[in-house]
């Protein structure tokens, strides 16, 4: 039985989150949480939070055993970008793009 957890509109770029997501793809959830505990990145906390949500969904909604769960799919998509303008010298301006992303984790036994 597949269980899905999504974390949407994360204020971090998809590229940064994919670095962490690739570490736990196709791993058992217990091992994946151990890996995320020792990764020193902001994205690791975001991925861990979403993974724990997927585990809780599997346990509560379907009564699945945590020890048998694996991360079947994990993917990060780009979300909408927030665009800002930064004034520069001589009347010019630069564009600041604040990127967001959507994280989806699917666990199954």
Curated annotation (Swiss-Prot):
Protein task? This protein binds specifically to 23S rRNA; its binding is stimulated by other ribosomal proteins, e.g. L4, L17, and L20. It is important during the early stages of 50S assembly. It makes multiple contacts with different domains of the 23S rRNA in the assembled 50S subunit and ribosome.
Q: Which UniProt keywords apply?
A: Ribonucleoprotein, Ribosomal protein, RNA-binding, rRNA-binding
Q: Which GO terms describe its cellular component?
A: cytosolic large ribosomal subunit
Identify this protein by name: Large ribosomal subunit protein uL22
Top-rank taxon of the source lineage equals Bacteria
The reply to whether rRNA-binding figures as a keyword in the UniProt entry is yes
Q: Which gene encodes it?
A: rplV
Q: What organism is the protein native to?
A: Blochmanniella floridana
KW rRNA-binding (keyword) present: yes
Q: How does it assemble?
A: Part of the 50S ribosomal subunit.
One GO term under biological process is: translation
Q: Which family does it belong to?
A: Belongs to the universal ribosomal protein uL22 family.
């Amino acid at each position: 039985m597949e269980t899905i957890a999504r974390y949407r509109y994360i204020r971090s770029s998809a590229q940064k989150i994919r670095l962490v997501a690739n570490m736990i793809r196709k791993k058992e959830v217990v091992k994946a949480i151990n890996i995320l505990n020792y990764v020193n990145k902001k994205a690791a906390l975001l991925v861990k939070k979403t993974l724990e949500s997927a585990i809780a969904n599997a346990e509560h909604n379907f009564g699945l055993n945590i020890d048998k769960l694996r991360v079947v799919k994990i993917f990060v998509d780009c979300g909408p970008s927030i665009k800002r303008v930064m004034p520069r010298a001589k009347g010019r301006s630069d564009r600041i793009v604040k990127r967001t992303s959507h994280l989806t984790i699917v666990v199954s036994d």
